[in-house]
Structure formats: structure tokens, C-alpha cells
Amino acid sequence: QAEDETSVPMAVEELLSMPTLEIQPIIFEQRYIPTEMCMRVARSSLRTPPPLPCSPKLYHGVHLFIFVHGFQGQSCDLRLFKNCISLLYPDTCCHLSEANERNTEGDIKDMGRRLADEVRAKVDEWCATEASLARISFVVHSLGGLITRAALPLLADFSSKFHSFISLSSPHLGYMHNANKIVEAGLWVLKKWKKSLSLQQLTMSDTKDPRDSCLYELSGNDSLRNFNHICLVSSFQDHYAPFESARVEVSEDTHADSKFGEVYSEMASRIFKSVDIAAVVRLDVIFKIAEKNLDSLIGRAAHIQFLECIPLMRMFVHTYTTFFR
């Protein structure tokens, strides 16, 4: 007698949480460990440093996450990342920044002021007293990373609450060394045609002397030192945010640049001058981008993947738990 098909249990699989190799990004991690730990690692003959701690420090109160979009972006751009955090850490409060939705072509410092005002408004709205605010973390994409850094000095009274600064392909050192000529041409057109001040600032063409530029001034802001965790995420495939700029690193090509190399190196040093380097994690992401089109050619496809690649986001919130709780 044939077996009744209705009685056969059906396998239930959640394929999204375990993506296939065709869509799973490849991620390389770089971080620093204290000298004394290096000595212990050397003595124990371990070839890799110990993993990041999984047990977070206990805290009481609200952990507020602020998500900041990039150039010509919208508040909903980072909604998928927000959803991943909210599902795994339901006690967190998440806000998608709206302060600069229609103003990303203006002055980065003005955008920072608007963001700071918005953060204060959310603290007042969600935290009845200052004591109920335990932590503030930022998840930023593209230009949003520089906008956030411009806002941090204006939030100095909350600096003891700063917890995680997660930067997704943000050009912290600008666009001085962009290898993609098509992107460079596009930037030139936007600067000339739309008179975009923020793009002038990103290319350090807003002043004659680069040391008077907005980006150089911003590099002297030491507010990042107040964060317990700083994560700089980058991709070689993304030409909208140059690789070294997103990682705040100085390459050999930069040292060889007689025009901007010295200024570029100074900016990188100034950003990390007061930062505990053990708090910094750099992630290099390689996306599976199958389709060959203009977006993949100019690097826009990878830039957008930071907003759309759910496997990357899920890996992030499950692996780096101390960033989120």
C-alpha cells in the first residue's frame, strides 16, 4: 500500500540564514592586539590572535543606535541592517536618521549640526532621564561616516555613552586616490554642474591649501577615541569609497604622491592620534557580483551591497556581539 503523502514530514529549511556560496560574501578581518598579549601569543605558539570577547559588559538603560545614510541617500537606506539588529537585540532602540535626507550636497559641518540636533531630540524622546541612556552607537554608510564625525564634537556631553562606531564604506580620507577614472569624471561633473559643496570637500578642492580644507579640519576631531569599538568596513570592489580611505590607511602609492601624500598621511595619523588601536577592527569584504554592467564597472554595485547584502549583515550582528549589546 502506498504511503499517504500527507503523513510524510516535510523538511523545513531557512535558507536565508545559511546562504549558498553563490551569494555569501568573503570577509577578511584585521585587528590589533596589545603588546603584552602579542608576547603571550608568541610564547604559546598560537598562529592567530584570540577571538574578540563574546560576553558584553553589563549595563542598565537604553542602547540607542543611530543609522546615517550617505550622499543623496534616504533614511530607509539602512533599514535592513536596522532590522537585523532589532531582531537579534530587541532591547535596543534604533533610529534611521532623517535630518539630511534632502541636504547631502551642502556643507558637511552643517549636516553634522543637523544630525547632532536630531540625536538630542531622540534622546529626549526615548530616554526620560539622562541616567536612562546607557549607550549610543552609530552605523554609518558612505558620506554618513563623515557627517557623523562632524556631529560627534557637538554631542560631547554624551561622549561617556559612546559605544560602537560602525563605518560601512565611508571615505574618511576623501577621494584623493580614486583609481576609477569614470568615478573621477562623474565627481567633476557633479561638482561643476550641481555645485555640490560636499563633493568639493570630499575631493579637498574646497580650499586652495588642503590643510585648510573641511576634511583636514575634521581629521583633527578626536571624538572617535570615546568609542569602545570602531569598525571600518571596506571593499576593493567599491570605487565610490576608495579602499584605503574607507579603512583610514596609507598605501605605498600615497607615500609616493608628491602633491597630496604628506597631507593624506597627516590626516590618517590625526584621526587615530588618540584612539586605542586595540578598539579598531577593519573588515575587507568581497561580494559576489555576477552581473557585469555599468554599476559593477564603476564600483557602485559593491557600494550598494553594503545596504542590501543580508548575509553580510547577519554575519556581522551574530559575530561581533560586543558591538551591539
Feature-to-residue mapping (PLM):
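Lipid deacylating catalytic domains
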Residues: 1-17, 21-139, 143-325
